[in-house]
Amino acid sequence: MESKSLNTLALRCAARKIPASEFLNLYKEFYNETFPANSIDNDDAKTQEGSGSQDKTDVEESISKPVGSKNDPVAILCAEFMKLLENGKYVILADYVVEVLFVNYHSELVREFLPKLKDLMNKGILIHFFSKSCAFFVNLTDNLVISQLIKDLRATIVPCILETNFCDISNELVVAIAKFLQAVLRFTPQPIQINSETYRDNTFNLTKRLSLINKILSKKFAGIIDKKLQFKEVLGPFTKDSTLDFDNSPSITSPQFIPSPLPSMKERSVTSSQSAIKYKDLKLLRYYKNIWLNSKLMNWQPFDSEFISNYSAIKSSLYPDQVQNIQNVDLLFTDLIETAFTCFAQFVSNKLYHQSNSTYNLLERKWILFLSKILPLLVYKNSSRTAHVIGNALDGIDDKVIKAISAYYQENDDGRSRNDDLFDDYPSTSLDIRHDFIKSLTMLGVVPPVFITNYLRGDQTVDSKALATTDDLTFTNQQGIIEIVNDIPNFIRSSLEGMEMENVSEPTLVSSNGLLQVLSNFDTVSPTKQFELANAIVDMLSESSTTFELNTFVKLTAVLTFNYSHSLTSILMYVTPEVLTKLYLEFVDKHWNSQVIGKQETDGESQFENVNISMSFSWAILMLTILYKQYHIDFVSMRADYTTDNIKNSFAITFVENLPDISDLFFIDEKNSDDPEVQVKSHKLVRDWLNDLFVNGSLSDSLLQNIEPKQLAILVPYIFKQVTLAMEIGAVGDLQNLIGGFEYFLQPFMLVGLIKVMYWLEQYLSCLKSDETDEKLIQKVLSLLNTIICPSTLNEDSKAFHFAVLRLNAIPLLGILYQFRSNKHAESNYGIYSSDNEGNPTLELMISRLISSLSISPVYDIDSTILVTDNNFVQKPPKFQSFFVTNEISMNKMLTNQMNSFWSLHSSTYYNLDFLKTLIDTLTPKQFLLDVLRTLEYKVETLGVKDVRNKSSSNESDQVIDYLFYFLVLYDIENSEDAKAMAQFMEDTVDISINGDSGIVKQETQPKSEYNPDDDIDMLFGENDTSMQANEEDTLDNKELKSDRNCALGKNRHTFGFIIHEIKLSYGTLESDSMSYEDYKKICEYHSRYLKMLKTCIF
């Protein structure tokens, strides 16, 4: 070597960016040339021989032991290393030091060098040194190095670290040292005894500092200190209290296992039984809160101040005989935050591990909106707004909850590479719902920006400086300048005035308009401004619908239908669907009729006004269709001042609830369809329209002036159906004339007719495909469909509405169109390279158009792989149904899984409520109820309560039924008004009409017993699930009865409370011949139990 200086060698290597592993080879060559008498091999041998003598050396003696002289090679090298680290010119220099010290483990060098680190002034390079060392020890597997490390831990490493005064160093260095200690201490097989009080105090200060910086790391660090360090004759500051105050436990709603104190208590009688009862109470409370929160989200209930008071009253409603401690608001929010994240973890785990046969995600989106926006808003409005409230809540979240949430987000992160990271202890960049929660709180000023780093640094990396610290609503104007919105209503009005309707459906053009820009980034808007925007938009819609400001009404409705960045879903969470539903129902059924008559009596209205009149009706119907089909809003249950007669006379409700049905007869006035004059006029109107559309090739003014959009909404689908069926039987042969006539359906005033067409096509194309139809006929049908799905040109007023109509029923249509592809084996060739685009060009064009309509903004309950179009080979068959039954996942298995969940007293249902609702509707509520009751009765009677060693007492058996009935009541009832009405109904002894079978059906087969251990927390990870094996016997008779959900009078007939009441009243009638007196007594007991819960539960 030219230079005898290690410093010079290292700096030259760092300048050339030579890796640490290559530097080690150069270092060995330098060492052997510079110190030939102390070569690397000889030195290592001496180290191994002499290391054994250190085992019995006390910690303090090892530190005070003199080191070698100035001419000693070890001392020279240590001095050179200190110069390198002080230099700080290259970060890689710290990597070189770690490589020499630990990778090429040198005990004497470690003992000499580590005590000098406390004098190092360059703290940045010191942080990197500890981080790099930690990364090495985390993955260390070399037994020789581990044995040397264990000897040095006791003698050198731990004492050197604990000499540090942790009160005077930076937060970053505290975390780096803690992680280093955590990594090395895990290797020691026996606890290291510490005699020094200074070391004990410094350890306490380190843990205290860490708890203020990173709560999660602090928990883990305190745990390993408890295990690996023993402070002589001193009570360990990290020992946990063995007596837990169960009543005030911060884990009251956490799935963390709460050990029953029964085995560990010496007083066995009264005290142990009371403790066991408390444990059961906590478990039931956790279960109730889970269903309560899920039901509230499922039913779009408002989150206002009443929500907080109702939540606080849950425990007292469950246990009215217990004395309840009065919680202040901050403690209440601590519990609510912890409960909400726990419930979300259970929700995503159910979806990840139990629901592979569904694609539901609307309820998940509601959970995300609740945790990221609404919960921070509730904290901001109702709590003391102090950061320690949030800190305490996040501290209380169980580690398995965090693991479950992180695992779910990693599973759904398409961009994440799933390889094993060499340094897996390093922070990752994967974000989850906790980040969004804290970001919103930071916007509202509840917590500082550094809060997110302090609490989530353990496994996530976030730049706290980039976080928004105000709730300002901003947008970028056309000059590229960011503006702050101070007056939201004026901002909306000015944006609407400059908005071009044709740009509403173009994602690339939304940035040109302020409102579209804000809605397209709605998830980044602060909760307070989201709330203000939601209320301002609804107020403006209400005002414009009553004053007939149709330009405002049309544009606002059009913007909302596309749901950019989940904006419509968010608005529904803030104002509830009932408000919007009532608004649009009243516009269609009341305001529109009166206003249109007034407009028609006024002469001189412009073409622009005519278009707005027709388009306002069309957009209103489209919005109602979205609310009903995509958001599953039951119009009748909205209580929008509709009596039974009004419901029958409501055009909006009748239209939307019968979307796939196109009648074979058309009448101008459905109410007077028996009137001969109406029949003659209707026949003449249809004949004139057919003649103008398909013979004359143009529509006369008289036809256009004498028909209303309501009539067109029914006439257009009627004509479409009749013409298509006529072509199918060969009654019509001129395809070009038909195409020319269908093109008129794309005019703005006629587009409303396509709504029904899109739903009718689903069943028509299914029949066409299943009938082995001639290919020529299929080509003709596809050509006709191509006219309305992929038009060559569109009016600027038609463009956005046409795109929105395509989105309505695109998923089922895509599923059927895929079946028409010529590549019939594409789905079976899964994993084999094969192009999807082998079908008819017209067919592929329609498929592409439908996919593009879905891709511009969120659509719910669909398989996301449908929207992936850049793959050149089939990876996996897409799912076109949101719920499906397979041979592996049968109805019997699903029902049994849920029944076993009730029996096992899990803290959440096995399936999420959206999945369960479909399961219950498919089986019918009555069949579900009877099957579950029969099976639980059998299990409790013969097997007792799961995981209870002895045969259960009556109280324990009752708890299983209680779990079921709390679910039934919360599933049925949305609010206290419904509960009062149902209670009054069930207390009435007047007979009711009986529909369908009633009575308890005798069980012919006994369900197979299950003894798999299934702790409550295992539900989070799909472990020890209650699934039946493939060879288990069926426990139900598969029946699929049609549910009369659309009938106002029949709605309550499908609640569990109604069914129980119906069965009770049916005793003694002809329909109940199979019901014994014992069965009747049982149903009376269940009736009383349900009624009692109705009166005591919080809704």
From Swiss-Prot:
Belongs to the Mediator complex subunit 5 family. One of its GO terms (cellular component) is mediator complex. InterPro entries: Mediator_Med5_fun (IPR014801). It comes from the Eukaryota. Component of the Mediator complex, a coactivator involved in the regulated transcription of nearly all RNA polymerase II-dependent genes. Mediator functions as a bridge to convey information from gene-specific regulatory proteins to the basal RNA polymerase II transcription machinery. Mediator is recruited to promoters by direct interactions with regulatory proteins and serves as a scaffold for the assembly of a functional preinitiation complex with RNA polymerase II and the general transcription factors. It is found in: Nucleus. Keywords: Activator, Nucleus, Transcription, Transcription regulation. Component of the Mediator complex. The keyword Nucleus applies. This is Mediator of RNA polymerase II transcription subunit 5. GO terms for molecular function: transcription coregulator activity. Residues 41-66 are annotated as: Disordered. One of its GO terms (biological process) is RNA polymerase II preinitiation complex assembly.
